[in-house]
């Protein structure tokens, strides 16, 4: 990897999307409503070859706040809230059964949160059974994954997940340094995570992911490298190493973080440079902008073939799926639309009580949106772009259609961060760290001064 010129690199740090969707969630609007979603369901059900389904269920509850977290969560310790939520999930599932063909093949199944394992094993089993009764056609090679908080994970949880066919677990680790954990209000010793991982391995879980975050308060390069040494002892198959997005104007809990303890941009870049070098020496290959996988892992093999895809859950080898979002604040996607459920429980429940799908907002994509989405997702996933693939799919002359955008990439080429070739362009290893910046050049919605986004570095 090129050595980072920190002074020059700092100029690229500006607010920008992470492109888990395009158009991004800030473009979702209330013009996309329940009827819009029902129409989208009908259109997709009646395609000649309907896409497989990906089911995402949001389980929003947490016992206490982790100050770094930007997820949609509800803090509670009340058992009755969980019981009530399950009853409303069942109402939503019944409405989905009437609104779409739920007998289509299911290729992916994911529990996110919140803390999914804050629900008891019996409750998790009840939720899973309810979903499987409505969506019964699980593929033989289905990916079933669940986010795990090691502080709320028991053998009984693992037994339930195993019995229901889960084969992928993602552990929220963040950092093993106690001073960092204290600053972000999430104490979980190495031994706790070690015990959870051993439990998963004992049950034959073959795909284990760790979520790590750099840029947290009290972090240093030396401290984070020590965390990575501990990580290697647990031998995860994949790592997601996120740049901490400090957006206290969006997430109030982040205001509890002492900003004087946050590492500087230069410190963050040093951490990033060192972690990439460390992980690659340990045989973890960089995937896209923030994931790592062992060289024999399916993610890396898909990257070699330029077949990776990116969605709200990260990177996947599944080419195209229609995501059905279930639960409060969950997001669904169908290639030509996005939909999001109500973000607060009151409106979510009220819609269901009235017999309506709890759609708060979304967006129907124009043909131009679909084209730009494909370009941006190819860049975000594979760090390169083959013009011919876009031209064949959309019947466009890429260089003519994106003449202005390609001109805007020239400075990256001059800086040695990207190279053009006869087929298209490819980012260098260091340039891949700026993939968000480069993707922004193809975003037709950016208006400048995007303060609602986190910084790209």
UniProtKB/Swiss-Prot annotation:
Pathway: Porphyrin-containing compound metabolism; protoporphyrin-IX biosynthesis; protoporphyrinogen-IX from coproporphyrinogen-III (AdoMet route): step 1/1. Residues 47-279 form the Radical SAM core domain. [4Fe-4S] cluster binds at residues 62, 66, 69. Keywords: 4Fe-4S, Cytoplasm, Iron, Iron-sulfur, Metal-binding, Oxidoreductase, Porphyrin biosynthesis, S-adenosyl-L-methionine. Pfam families: HemN_C, Radical_SAM. It is an enzyme of class 1 (oxidoreductase). It catalyses: coproporphyrinogen III + 2 S-adenosyl-L-methionine = protoporphyrinogen IX + 2 5'-deoxyadenosine + 2 L-methionine + 2 CO2. It is found in: Cytoplasm. S-adenosyl-L-methionine 1 binds at residues 56, 113, 147, 331. GO terms for molecular function: 4 iron, 4 sulfur cluster binding; coproporphyrinogen dehydrogenase activity; coproporphyrinogen oxidase activity; metal ion binding. S-adenosyl-L-methionine 2 binds at residues 68, 114-115, 174, 186, 211, 245. CDD domains: Radical_SAM. GO terms for cellular component: cytoplasm. InterPro entries: Coprogen_oxidase_HemN, Coproporphyrinogen-III_oxidase, Elp3/MiaA/NifB-like_rSAM, HemN_C, rSAM, rSAM_horseshoe. One of its GO terms (biological process) is protoporphyrinogen IX biosynthetic process. Involved in the heme biosynthesis. Catalyzes the anaerobic oxidative decarboxylation of propionate groups of rings A and B of coproporphyrinogen III to yield the vinyl groups in protoporphyrinogen IX. Monomer. Belongs to the anaerobic coproporphyrinogen-III oxidase family. This is Oxygen-independent coproporphyrinogen III oxidase. It comes from Helicobacter pylori (strain ATCC 700392 / 26695).
């Amino acid at each position: 990897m090129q050595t980072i010129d920190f002074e020059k690199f700092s100029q690229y740090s500006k607010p920008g999307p992470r492109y888990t969707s395009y158009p991004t969630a800030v473009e979702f609007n209330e013009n996309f409503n329940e009827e819009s979603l029902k129409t989208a369901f009908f259109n997709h059900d009646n395609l000649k070859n309907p896409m497989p389904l990906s089911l995402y269920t949001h389980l929003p509850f947490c016992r206490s706040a982790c100050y770094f977290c930007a997820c949609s969560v509800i803090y509670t310790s009340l058992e009755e809230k969980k019981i009530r939520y399950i009853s409303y999930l069942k109402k939503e599932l019944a409405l989905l059964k009437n609104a779409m063909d739920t007998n289509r093949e299911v290729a992916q199944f994911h529990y996110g949160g919140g803390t999914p394992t804050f629900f008891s094993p019996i409750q998790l089993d009840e939720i899973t059974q309810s979903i499987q009764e409505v969506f019964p056609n699980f593929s033989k090679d289905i990916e079933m994954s669940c986010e795990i908080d090691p502080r709320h994970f028991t053998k009984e949880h693992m037994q339930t997940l195993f019995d229901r066919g889960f084969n992928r677990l993602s552990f929220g680790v963040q950092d093993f340094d106690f001073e960092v954990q204290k600053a972000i209000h999430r104490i979980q010793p190495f031994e706790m995570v070690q015990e959870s991982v051993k439990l998963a391995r004992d049950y034959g879980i073959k795909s284990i992911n760790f979520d790590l975050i750099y840029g947290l308060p009290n972090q240093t390069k030396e401290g984070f490298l020590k965390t990575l040494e501990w990580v290697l002892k647990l031998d995860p198959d994949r790592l997601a190493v996120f740049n901490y997005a400090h957006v206290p104007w969006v997430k109030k809990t982040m205001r509890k973080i002492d900003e004087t303890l946050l590492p500087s941009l230069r410190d963050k870049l040093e951490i990033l440079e060192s972690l990439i070098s460390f992980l690659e020496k340990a045989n973890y290959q960089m995937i896209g902008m923030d994931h790592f996988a062992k060289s024999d892992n399916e993610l890396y093999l898909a990257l070699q073939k330029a077949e990776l895809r990116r969605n709200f859950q990260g990177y996947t080898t599944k080419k195209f799926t229609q995501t059905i979002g279930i639960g409060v604040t969950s997001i669904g996607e169908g290639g030509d639309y996005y939909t999001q459920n109500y973000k607060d429980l009151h409106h979510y429940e009220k819609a269901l009580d009235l017999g309506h799908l709890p759609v708060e907002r979304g967006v129907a994509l124009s043909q131009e949106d679909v084209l730009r989405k494909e370009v941006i997702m190819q860049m975000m996933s594979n760090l390169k772009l083959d013009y011919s693939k876009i031209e064949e799919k959309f019947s466009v002359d890429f260089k003519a259609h994106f003449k202005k955008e390609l001109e805007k990439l020239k400075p990256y080429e001059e800086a040695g961060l990207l190279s053009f070739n006869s087929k298209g362009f490819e980012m260098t290893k260091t340039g891949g760290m700026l993939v968000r910046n480069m993707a922004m050049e193809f975003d037709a919605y950016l208006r400048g001064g995007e303060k609602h986004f986190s910084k790209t570095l």
